[in-house]
Amino acid sequence: ELRQKVFETARDWFSFPQHERLHVTVADAWHTLETLPVASTAMIVTDLYSADRMSPLQAQRRFIKACARALKPDGWLVLNYHRMPEPDGNLLRELKRQFPCLLTFKSKTNNWVIYGCNRAFDPWQIPDAVLKALEEQLPVGWPALMKKIRVL
């Protein structure tokens, strides 16, 4: 997160989870990505927006490459876009180059969330018991979410 106050508001008012394995960096995203060690991060969640628009950085190939470089071999990149990248555009091509597994869904607010990982993953083979356990750790309505996901 770029602004400390945004993080504090999320933590104090919107049930932002706190856990020893979760680290939030309050800094410029590009600078942070450039300084992360190779294969050091399990998950990167990007939601780079100002008050009126998405940051152009989030749609750049260099940003996607930097995220891929920082992720562990079994790591995940989660991107929030205000519209789906063009099917034949540079951004989606770069995502496919860096992440053999790409999943997406359209949120209630009409944003597109893209999940990328470096390993084979079949989201439809997850047992209900695993989804229930995941729901206890991160309550986002996993069973309903899994019904919306599609492969890119």
Where are the predicted features?
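The AdoMet/dcAdoMet-binding core of the Class I SAM-like
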Residues: E1-R69
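Short "lid" loop at the C-terminus of a central beta-strand within the Rossmann-like core
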Residues: S50-A51, H82-P87
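Alpha-helical subdomain
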Residues: Q58, R83-P85, N111
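Conserved Class I S-adenosyl-L-methionine
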Residues: K65, G89-N110
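Conserved beta-strand signature within the Rossmann-like core of class I S-adenosyl-L-methionine
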Residues: D74-Y81
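SAM/dcSAM-binding transferase cores
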Residues: R93, K108-L152
